[in-house]
């Protein structure tokens, strides 16, 4: 994997950790990895590389507010690394975040640092498969900078149908038998 940009969002040690961590999390049921981050592309390349190495059908969806902040862009690093298992989306971050939650088995968040609790509630409410969430907390970057959670979908019990009894109308006409006496 080749990361072309000189700007590094995370240290080399943290990069190795996230690569190994995600690679270990990927299993045969993993379809999509959602990355919400600062658009330097370092983690995008790492996630795409881990996914490509472990399960070639796994796709990385990378979203950010804008995609031209850094040069060279993440797409250039992905292209030179021959990693084509990615989708890069920019703009309207909140909407894209909510749309892509349902598609992801693994979510990496390096954004929303001050509102992570509300974003976790959105994740809990919208996931449809068990999902692993990795949050990079820059305040803990001297230690292990990642907080990991697993969120399972809430399965609501289905309402049971009440047994309905159907009553057939009863014919209430009474027939009287009259006996005729014969003499």
Predicted regions and their residues:
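S-adenosylmethionine/decaboxylated-SAM
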Residues: 3-8, 12-156
């Amino acid at each position: 994997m080749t990361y072309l940009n000189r700007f590094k969002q995370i240290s080399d040690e943290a990069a190795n950790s996230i690569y190994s961590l995600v690679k270990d999390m990927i299993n045969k049921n993993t379809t999509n990895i959602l990355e919400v981050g600062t658009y330097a592309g370092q983690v995008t390349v790492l996630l795409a590389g881990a996914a490509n190495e472990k399960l070639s059908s796994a796709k990385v969806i990378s979203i950010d507010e804008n995609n031209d902040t850094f040069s060279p862009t993440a797409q250039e690093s992905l292209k030179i690394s021959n990693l084509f298992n990615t989708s890069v989306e920019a703009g309207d971050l909140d909407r894209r975040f909510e749309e892509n939650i349902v598609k992801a088995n693994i979510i990496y968040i390096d954004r929303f640092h001050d509102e992570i609790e509300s974003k976790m509630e959105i994740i809990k409410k919208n996931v449809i498969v068990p999902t692993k969430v990795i949050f990079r907390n820059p305040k803990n970057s001297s230690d292990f900078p990642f907080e990991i959670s697993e969120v399972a979908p809430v399965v609501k019990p289905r309402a049971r149908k009440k047994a309905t009894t159907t009553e057939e109308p009863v014919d209430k006409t009474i027939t009287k038998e009259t006996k005729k006496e014969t003499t």
